[in-house]
């Protein structure tokens, strides 16, 4: 089975529209883009188009590529103070002279659309999933939507980034999976992946995972986005692995749409949290 990320994202968007209607106002998302990275510009356009579909107000703040750290942090602090901005997203990567960790920590935890703030990451490790990284949230949503029994399952994640691997491991542990986290330095990677019932690959290595590394009937989520001979491919050898997997996400059209849809969901969550604070 091909796991259709676009179809699942459409379901999430429908849920988000209903939540916006119940709120009674349009939540606000502010994105910050530093420089003119073409890929980042494309991702920003995709996110803002998605906001428009579900009734989220969005604005994009573009700063020059030579913006200094002080200016970036002041821009973030200004958005933190605005009542009409419920969620803030800092588009990565930043230019090399800027420290993404300092910038992320400047975002108010209550407005952290990406779920990268240490306070939100810490809450996740303690089992409280309020604002969490969007890609892991999308993967867990897909597993639950497909009726996969996460509890007690053998889950292997290839990739240990703060964006995908580490937070996803915490989310799966919160659901009582048995989780292994591997990476490109793991020795004998096949020995770890071949028994996985849930396999998530976010290593940034084109077609790293071959068919003989995958268990029959596994659910495989390919987070990789790589360019090979002018084509976009994932970290999984899709054509070979799809013959063995119970479900597999394609690249493109798999995890990417889920990630964007979860950004919308988290923006509404941030607005709901803001409303609760006002009422308490």
Curated annotation (Swiss-Prot):
Identify the InterPro entries for this entry.
Answer: Aminoacid_DH-like_N_sf, NAD(P)-bd_dom_sf, THF_DH/CycHdrlase, THF_DH/CycHdrlase_cat_dom, THF_DH/CycHdrlase_NAD-bd_dom
UniProt keywords (A-Z) are: Amino-acid biosynthesis, Histidine biosynthesis, Hydrolase, Methionine biosynthesis, Multifunctional enzyme, NADP, One-carbon metabolism, Oxidoreductase, Purine biosynthesis
Residues involved in NADP(+) binding: 159-161, 225
Task: Please give the Gene3D superfamilies that the UniProt record associates with this protein.
Answer: Leucine Dehydrogenase, chain A, domain 1, NAD(P)-binding Rossmann-like Domain
Q: In which pathway does it act?
A: One-carbon metabolism; tetrahydrofolate interconversion
Gene Ontology CC entries for this record = cytosol
Q: What is its EC number?
A: 1.5.1.5, 3.5.4.9
Q: MF terms per GO, please? A: methenyltetrahydrofolate cyclohydrolase activity; methylenetetrahydrofolate dehydrogenase (NADP+) activity
Biological processes annotated in GO: L-histidine biosynthetic process; methionine biosynthetic process; purine nucleotide biosynthetic process; tetrahydrofolate interconversion
Amino-acid biosynthesis as UniProt keyword: yes
Catalyses: (6R)-5,10-methylene-5,6,7,8-tetrahydrofolate + NADP(+) = (6R)-5,10-methenyltetrahydrofolate + NADPH; (6R)-5,10-methenyltetrahydrofolate + H2O = (6R)-10-formyltetrahydrofolate + H(+)
Q: Which family does it belong to?
A: Belongs to the tetrahydrofolate dehydrogenase/cyclohydrolase family.
SUBUNIT field: Homodimer.
Q: State the protein's purpose.
A: Catalyzes the oxidation of 5,10-methylenetetrahydrofolate to 5,10-methenyltetrahydrofolate and then the hydrolysis of 5,10-methenyltetrahydrofolate to 10-formyltetrahydrofolate.
Stated name of the protein:
Bifunctional protein FolD
Originating organism: Methanothrix thermoacetophila (strain DSM 6194 / JCM 14653 / NBRC 101360 / PT)
Recorded name of the encoding gene? folD
